[in-house]
């Protein structure tokens, strides 16, 4: 073999080995696909966790210095199953589907049939989102309707410093633990003729928070309305304006390796 041929072979194998080394390196392992603006279905972040709809606001790809508020939406019993598109029939994902300028990066997980919301799974999902996208860690919001409203109360009670504000729609919480929410901005919504989740569920939580000295709780009761308090609640721009006014005094989620 001539010297020039040997040199070419050496360069070839050097380049090949370098490519393999880079592919196995931590830098390559952290490479992530570029996010897509708009609303897209996403697989579960781990086995046993929830698939979800992810909404990325218009402008996310061009304004790369901007951090976005994160809104977590928990649906009700009627949307459970294996079709993640069903989470878009109500609430923030419905709004985001028709408005690309909806200002929140929105995560809407899907419960499987006969499942209930698991806070540990939700925590891991939100930690993943916060580390992956440009989230403002002082503006993380939670909302849910019916079964998702129950879970919103429960999650907020378990971690009252995780969220800047919570909006619980047609849900009920545990008044015995309401004092944990005395410093958290909360807005509860209910129809006064709800015979699925009685409006007393929201009344009791608001009373209990106020009895503890909480002054950041709001309660909206819709007259002559049944269980569907979510349409008027989520269609009201005042809700989203109120959410955006609330901020945590310090971050409670990490924000590394963001896309």
Name every feature range the model reports, one short phrase each.
Residues 26-70, 150, 155, 167, ...:
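A domain-start/cap signature at the N-terminus of enzymes
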Residues 59-66, 114-146:
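Gly/Ser-rich "nucleophile elbow"/oxyanion-hole loop immediately N-terminal to the catalytic nucleophile
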Residues 70, 74-124:
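Active-site machinery of serine-nucleophile hydrolases
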Residues 138-182:
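Primarily recognizes the serine-hydrolase "nucleophile elbow" in alpha/beta-hydrolase
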Residues 188-190, 194:
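Short beta-strand/loop motif that positions the catalytic acidic residue
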Residues 196-201:
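Conserved alpha/beta-hydrolase "acid-adjacent" motif
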Residues 226-233:
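Catalytic histidine-centered segment of alpha/beta-hydrolase-like enzymes
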Residues 235-255:
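Catalytic active-site module of serine/aspartate enzymes centered on a nucleophile-bearing elbow/loop
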């Amino acid at each position: 073999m001539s010297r020039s041929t040997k040199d070419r072979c050496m360069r070839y194998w050097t380049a090949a080995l370098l490519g393999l080394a880079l592919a196995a390196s931590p830098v390559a392992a952290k490479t992530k696909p570029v996010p897509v603006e708009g609303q897209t279905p996403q697989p579960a972040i781990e086995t046993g966790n929830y698939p979800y709809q992810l909404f990325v606001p218009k402008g996310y790809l061009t304004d790369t210095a901007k951090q976005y508020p994160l809104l977590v939406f928990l649906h009700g019993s009627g949307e459970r199953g294996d079709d993640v598109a069903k989470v878009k029939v109500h609430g923030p994902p419905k709004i985001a589907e028709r408005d690309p300028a909806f200002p929140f990066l929105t995560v809407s997980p899907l419960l499987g049939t006969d499942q209930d919301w698991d806070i540990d799974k939700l925590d891991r999902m939100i930690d993943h989102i916060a580390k992956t996208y440009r989230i403002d860690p002082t503006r993380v919001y939670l909302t849910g309707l019916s079964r998702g409203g129950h879970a919103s109360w429960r999650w907020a009670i378990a971690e009252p410093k995780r969220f800047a504000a919570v909006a619980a729609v047609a849900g009920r919480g545990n008044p015995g633990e309401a004092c944990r929410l005395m410093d958290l901005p909360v807005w509860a919504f209910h129809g006064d003729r709800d015979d699925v989740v009685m409006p007393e569920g929201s009344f009791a939580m608001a009373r209990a928070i106020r009895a503890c000295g909480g002054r950041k709780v709001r309660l909206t009761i819709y007259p002559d309305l049944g269980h569907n308090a979510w349409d008027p609640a989520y269609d009201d721009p005042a809700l989203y304006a109120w959410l955006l006014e609330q901020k945590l005094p310090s971050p409670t989620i990490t924000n590394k390796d963001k896309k």
